[in-house]
Amino acid sequence: MATPFLPSGATTGDSGGELSSGDDSGDMESFQTPEAEGTRSLAELFEKAAAHVQGLVQVASREQLLYLYARFKQVKVGNCNTPKPNFFDFEGKQKWEAWKALGDSSPSQAMQEYIAAVKKLDPGWNPQVSEKKGKEGSSGFGGPVVSSLYHEETIREEDKNIFDYCRENNIDHIAKAIKSKAADVNMTDEEGRALLHWACDRGHKELVKVLLQYEAGINCQDNEGQTALHYAAACEFLDIVELLLQSGADPTLRDQDGCLPEEVTGCKAVSLLLQRHRASKA
């Protein structure tokens, strides 16, 4: 569920059309022959290309990153289904426009173009060679121990948005952006996650304090119905759970699966704290 400049696995490409599926049919044929790939499906090749991208981010242009971002989203999500980002989110608007421009493009076409783009970037890439992988997870944000399910990317300074600075715990940058109104403290990413969700997910207690001082919506729910309290509980940050409760977080709000914050944690201390607080408010 991830959202920074590239989703986990996105690679580079060319927004000028050089990497269209029609122009690169030769590349695709070489990938899909039984001799070269055995029984690998197009989807498996796409996943391998996505894994390979992590080592190519630094050599890719902004246009290439946007090209691949859009196709990754088309494969994983489908047609663009999110509102256009606000005026101040310049990078977010570029990403949204690149994705939106694909219209009703099929996942198959998007995968073909994505794979061809990776081949253009690294002609020597061999998808039969396994990529080194970090922590993996099936659902990303919103599941147990959220951070462990989120793949980090290397993002160049000029490509960062407010959520990237939040991940990095860059309190000064975030405070200045909010104070100057360059960013709204309650702005959300495409998954409905606000800055407070991100800060709680990463365990950045001091940043959580700053966001609350700027009146972050403490009970704001993401697209899965999870609050910042769900995130802090799932990641087992007891001190942040305490801070949120002291600041007025509602432990009775349930996510779309019907789970309370106390039910998404594997930490007994966190669960007991939430239960006691909820009981005291009953």
Swiss-Prot record:
<keyword id="KW-0040">ANK repeat</keyword>
<feature type="region of interest" description="Disordered">
    <location>
        <begin position="1"/>
        <end position="39"/>
    </location>
</feature>
<dbReference type="InterPro" id="IPR035984">
    <property type="entry name" value="Acyl-CoA-binding_sf"/>
</dbReference>
<dbReference type="Pfam" id="PF00887">
    <property type="entry name" value="ACBP"/>
</dbReference>
<keyword id="KW-0677">Repeat</keyword>
<dbReference type="GO" id="GO:0008289">
    <property type="term" value="F:lipid binding"/>
</dbReference>
<keyword id="KW-0446">Lipid-binding</keyword>
<feature type="binding site">
    <location>
        <position position="114"/>
    </location>
    <ligand>
        <name>an acyl-CoA</name>
    </ligand>
</feature>
<feature type="modified residue" description="Phosphoserine">
    <location>
        <position position="106"/>
    </location>
</feature>
<dbReference type="InterPro" id="IPR036770">
    <property type="entry name" value="Ankyrin_rpt-contain_sf"/>
</dbReference>
<dbReference type="GO" id="GO:0005737">
    <property type="term" value="C:cytoplasm"/>
</dbReference>
<comment type="subunit">
    <text>Monomer.</text>
</comment>
<dbReference type="GO" id="GO:0005634">
    <property type="term" value="C:nucleus"/>
</dbReference>
<comment type="function">
    <text>Binds long-chain acyl-coenzyme A molecules with a strong preference for unsaturated C18:1-CoA, lower affinity for unsaturated C20:4-CoA, and very weak affinity for saturated C16:0-CoA. Does not bind fatty acids. Plays a role in protein N-myristoylation.</text>
</comment>
<dbReference type="InterPro" id="IPR000582">
    <property type="entry name" value="Acyl-CoA-binding_protein"/>
</dbReference>
<feature type="repeat" description="ANK 2">
    <location>
        <begin position="224"/>
        <end position="253"/>
    </location>
</feature>
<keyword id="KW-0539">Nucleus</keyword>
<feature type="binding site">
    <location>
        <position position="95"/>
    </location>
    <ligand>
        <name>an acyl-CoA</name>
    </ligand>
</feature>
<feature type="modified residue" description="Phosphoserine">
    <location>
        <position position="41"/>
    </location>
</feature>
<dbReference type="Pfam" id="PF12796">
    <property type="entry name" value="Ank_2"/>
</dbReference>
<dbReference type="InterPro" id="IPR002110">
    <property type="entry name" value="Ankyrin_rpt"/>
</dbReference>
<dbReference type="GO" id="GO:0000062">
    <property type="term" value="F:fatty-acyl-CoA binding"/>
</dbReference>
<dbReference type="InterPro" id="IPR014352">
    <property type="entry name" value="FERM/acyl-CoA-bd_prot_sf"/>
</dbReference>
<protein>
    <recommendedName>
        <fullName>Acyl-CoA-binding domain-containing protein 6</fullName>
    </recommendedName>
</protein>
<keyword id="KW-0597">Phosphoprotein</keyword>
<keyword id="KW-0963">Cytoplasm</keyword>
<feature type="repeat" description="ANK 1">
    <location>
        <begin position="191"/>
        <end position="220"/>
    </location>
</feature>
<feature type="domain" description="ACB">
    <location>
        <begin position="42"/>
        <end position="127"/>
    </location>
</feature>
<feature type="binding site">
    <location>
        <begin position="69"/>
        <end position="73"/>
    </location>
    <ligand>
        <name>an acyl-CoA</name>
    </ligand>
</feature>
